[in-house]
Every structure is written in C-alpha cells, then in structure tokens.
Amino acid sequence: MALENPKMHNSEISKRLGAEWKLLSEAEKRPFIDEAKRLRAMHMKEYPDYKYRP
C-alpha cells in the first residue's frame, strides 16, 4: 500500500490496513498470528533482558 501511495501518511495507511485486517477470517489471519508468536519467542530467547524503552 505504501509503495502504491508514496505520499500517503503512515496514519492513513495504518487505518486502511486495520480495516482490511478486520475483514479477514480467522483462517486468513492465522499465519500472521503464528508468525508473530514465533518471532516474539525468538526475540525473547535472543534478548532475554530486553526492555522496551520508548
């Protein structure tokens, strides 16, 4: 979406992607949810003392 609309603000891209995400079925969302869990576990293993500090 960002490549197709290079001048679109990030907030608008996020809003549109969120709307598209809500339209997906659980089966369509599952691969993304599983990958997020896998990456989270990998990050926790590689960086056990990591603390988010904005």
Swiss-Prot record:
It is found in: Nucleus. Pfam families: HMG_box. GO terms for biological process: brain development; negative regulation of transcription by RNA polymerase II; neuron differentiation. One of its GO terms (cellular component) is nucleus. Residues 1-51 bind DNA. GO terms for molecular function: DNA-binding transcription activator activity, RNA polymerase II-specific; RNA polymerase II cis-regulatory region sequence-specific DNA binding. The keyword DNA-binding applies. It comes from the Eukaryota. This is SRY-related protein AMA3. The lineage of its organism: Eukaryota, Metazoa, Chordata, Craniata, Vertebrata.
